[in-house]
Regions:
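Adenosine-cofactor binding site in Rossmann-like domains, unifying the SAM/SAH pocket
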Residues: 5-7
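A short glycine-rich, Lys/Arg-flanked "PGG" loop and its adjoining helix->strand segment in the class I
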Residues: 34-49
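Short, glycine-/aromatic-enriched active-site segment of Class I SAM-dependent methyltransferases
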Residues: 55-76
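Short alpha-helix
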Residues: 77-99
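A short acidic, Gly/Pro-enriched loop at the edge of an enzyme's catalytic core
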Residues: 9-21
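Conserved Class I S-adenosyl-L-methionine
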Residues: 100-162
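A short SAM/SAH-binding and catalytic strip from SAM-dependent methyltransferases
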Residues: 19-32
Length: 162
């Protein structure tokens, strides 16, 4: 097994050559997610799996607080609703095996992480704050608020080429 990182709109892979495609907190950065799903469908073998752990737009998306880890403002955020994601998956030729909302668990985890971040006297060696710098304190706070207020949701999706 091997891992490839590439442009999701133009994967350097032959048709029907992969057993699985994995996305984790990626779609929120992709302005043309329908085209990305079509590209995934192209490279997956028959019965290939698409696995996603993604942030989607919640019922109160208009109240989104920025910055967040994926976008400094609304112009750079490409969140879609869970219903839009389902529809795009089906239109791209996927059968949805499961679609689970993990938002409550994600919120609880993020709250625990925030508590650790504020208690630590020194920054952990590997952390989002290492990447984002001091901005991550605000991003993390906004992420917790957005999850708690229903502006975003976190979902797990398993789908099969069908």
């Amino acid at each position: 097994a091997h891992c490839i990182t590439a442009d999701a709109l133009n994967l350097p892979l032959a048709d029907a050559s992969m057993d699985a495609v994995l996305f984790q907190h990626s779609f929120l950065n992709m302005p043309d997610s329908a085209a990305v799903l079509n590209e995934c469908r192209r490279v997956l073998r028959p019965d290939g799996k698409l696995v996603m752990h993604e942030v989607v737009r919640g019922p109160h998306a208009n109240a989104m607080r920025y910055p967040v880890p994926w976008a400094s403002d609304a112009q750079h955020s490409h969140l879609e609703s869970a219903d839009q994601l389902r529809q795009q998956l089906e239109q791209a030729g996927f059968h949805i095996d499961h679609f689970i909302d993990w938002s409550d668990d994600a919120l609880a985890w993020r709250q625990r992480q925030r508590a650790k971040e504020t208690q630590q006297s020194r920054q952990a060696v590997l952390s989002p704050q290492l990447v984002f710098g001091e901005r991550f304190i605000t991003m993390g706070k906004n992420l917790v608020s957005n999850l708690g207020e229903g502006t975003i949701r976190v979902v797990e999706v398993g789908a099969t080429v069908g």
